[in-house]
Amino acid sequence: DYGVLEDAVHRLMTDLTRKLHELRPDVLIEFRQNYIGPVMRQYGNMFRVGDCPYSTSYNRVGIVDLRLTSGRTAVHSDMLMWNPEDRVENAACQIENVLFANVQLSARLDRIPEEHLRMMRFWTRLMQDEQHLLQEAPLYAEQPQMLYPVVRTEEKGRSVIACYQHGVLAEVPASRLDDVYLINANSGSTMLARFDQKARWKATVWNCLGEIQTEEEWEPEGLVEWKIPECGMVRLQKVR
């Protein structure tokens, strides 16, 4: 018997976790917000955002909060669903808001239009190709009082910067980056970025379907604004 509830709960969870791992060493144990915190990492190996149907901002904030407090524990989004008749840009916005976590797609693939499927293939392929940069590289999030309008990861000269509100500024430290994804994850058609030094880049712009819009060399300096499709993306690769 235990005289303190917290000690009893700890013993219960420890015993359960140990027994489950004995039965299956690769068992997956998931906890969902708000029953989580750094101490819960010793009991589970997946943390998931709480229920937030069709709430892109709640999903994003939940993911960032988990990423910043969960170490290397896997972080999962809440499931994604949308109206098949919705604009493809709105559907893309849902996926873009969970780029920095393991996405849980629950949209019925047999009920959504081909345009939505093309969009999903593009973004899920990016998440697979850049899994380490998106989910394991150090994550930085700005202005929690504004629900993290800019979120980025950066490691070894590469970065992903996602802007979730139109008009927010993306800081691009060109002095230390060679490869940058800038994601316009909002309803605007322009992006603002500030480069800390002049450099020459190959700039490839995609719309949310993964269709290339422009591909050119570019030499931005200081504060710049340029056209990026709604929920589209530009990749900047430094030219040597």
Which residues does each PLM region occupy?
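The substrate-binding groove and active-site-proximal loops of carbohydrate-active enzymes
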Residues: D1-V9, W82
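Tight coil/turn sites that cap or link beta-strands
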Residues: P229-M233
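Active-site-proximal substrate-binding groove within the catalytic cores of carbohydrate-active enzymes
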Residues: L12-I228
